[in-house]
Amino acid sequence: MKNHYALVVGGTGMLKNVCHWLIEQDYHVYVIGRNQSKLNKLKQETIQPENLHGVAVDYQNSTCLSNELSNLFETNGIPDIVVSWIHSSAPQALPLIKDMISKQDLSTDWRLIHIQGSARFLEKENTPVPKNCLYRRVYLGFILENNDSRWLTHNEISSGVIHAITTDSNETIVGTLEPWDMRPQ
């Protein structure tokens, strides 16, 4: 029987508490990150370092990402859950991850938690996914306080993503997106 595991893209920064939480839920967590020292620090900070595995690769480099994912999937099968915060500078990274998972196994369901910035909410893009992918979208909004607004903190983002995972809603908004003209600049 394979271990439950999660693949987290963007886990060394604002999603690090999501990584810690997944470990507390008995997942083996594989974190894709460009910076080996940040991956090492994340591992040192977790309560079960043996369950956190850094994958040092720049997801903007499709060839390197593909090689690392091939090794990971060959060893572990497909992940139970993918948590993805990918910058717009790498538009090919998420489609590559989805395609590689679907080539491995179309019979096992997996969840994709796709985290996007507030501006994506207006676009309502269609994100194609394989038939065995349970797609969930999380929009990161902002906080209104004292007639002003601010962006979400890393803790607020992580809490919102964890809420999205536990409730399994198709769409989650962390913070608020309205009124739109109150977004921080």
Q: Where does each model-flagged region fall?
A:
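Cofactor-binding loop segments of dinucleotide-utilizing enzymes, especially the Rossmann-like FAD-
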Residues: 11, 34, 117
